[in-house]
């Protein structure tokens, strides 16, 4: 994936994240919500690359380190992107993210990072987690491992379970 910069209307949130990381008070979970097409996924990619980068700056990921090279090759071992599955036979995409998918993601998040940095998991759209899947995620959201970032993307934040 290309390492991208953030859009101008995302600068205020970006600066909050930069300050949090500098103070070592980075939250472990984020909900990025907004209308479809405003750049949530673009912003999420920038944040993910920056968190995984071994030499991050206030402007973003360096683009040069091993972690950035793996990011650009779309093969970073400490990054997972979770979305509804597509049936191989029918080609139809499920309307929900299933509990088995979340359990696999939680297993990934409970392991140590392979590059000794962050582990980043993105769930898009988080509002299609079924109840069992959302409940499977709760303990990890409440008590994540060190250097873990979970990013939930949604166009419909009110559709998320209240506990999330």
Model-inferred region functions:
Residues 1-2, 164:
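Short glycine-enriched loop/turn motifs at secondary-structure junctions
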Residues 2-132:
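Clamp-loader machinery-focused feature within the broader ASCE/P-loop NTPase space
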Residues 57-60, 148, 152, 160:
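Short, surface-exposed helix-loop/turn micro-motifs enriched in polar/charged residues
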Residues 73-75, 144, 164:
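Short, structurally constrained coil/turn elements
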Residues 110, 135-152:
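Conserved catalytic/switch belt of AAA+ P-loop NTPases
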Residues 124-125, 152-157:
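A short beta-strand-to-loop transition that corresponds to the Sensor-1 phosphate-sensing loop
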Residues 129-130, 144, 159-160:
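Catalytic P-loop NTPase motifs of RecA-like helicase/translocase cores
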Residues 136-141, 157-164:
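Short regulatory helix/loop adjacent to the ATP-binding pocket of P-loop NTPases
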